[in-house]
Regions:
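N-terminal alpha/beta PP-like core and its mobile active-site loop of ThDP/TPP-dependent enzymes
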Residues: 1-146
């Protein structure tokens, strides 16, 4: 049965399922709460961590042990920057990890706040692939490419 209001959160969950993701590790935050709610309703198993670095390292562990992508889900700004150590380790070891970070509204990107960070640029040197989704229609493709 098709959902009446298919949201970006629904698309993320469907893409995770289609890529055999069993677990998502992360910390709720204002920019991603809608996705946490959707995961609790109909997603891979959600495991809340106490720090974003733990989420990245737990995702790496899943990737290493199963060969399936481990997923870390965090909010924008400091949430994303706290992933870097775990992502550097996963990248250097060749472990499959998908990091999903929230982002502020587009009109807030140029404001000087701790949440308004260029996430894709920040993670470019820590990962094999880093992108920011500008168009919801490309969300599934970007996630699958990662």
């Amino acid at each position: 049965m098709a959902k009446e209001n298919y949201s970006a959160a629904d698309m993320v969950i469907d893409t995770l399922k289609n890529n055999n993701v069993d677990y998502v590790f992360g910390i709720p935050g204002a920019k991603i709460d809608y996705l946490f709610d959707a995961l609790e309703d109909d997603g891979p198993e959600l495991i809340v961590t106490r720090h974003e670095q733990n989420a990245a390292m737990m995702a790496q562990g899943v990737g290493r042990l199963t060969g399936k992508p481990g997923v870390a889900l965090v909010t924008s700004g400091p949430g994303v920057s706290n992933l870097t150590t775990g992502l550097l380790t996963a990248t250097s070891e060749g472990d499959p990890v998908l990091a999903i970070g929230g982002q502020v509204k587009r009109n807030d990107l140029l404001r000087l706040t701790h949440q308004a960070v260029d996430n894709a640029a920040l993670l470019k040197s820590s990962t094999k692939y880093s992108a920011e989704v500008q168009d919801p229609e490309s969300l599934s493709e970007v996630m699958t490419n990662a």
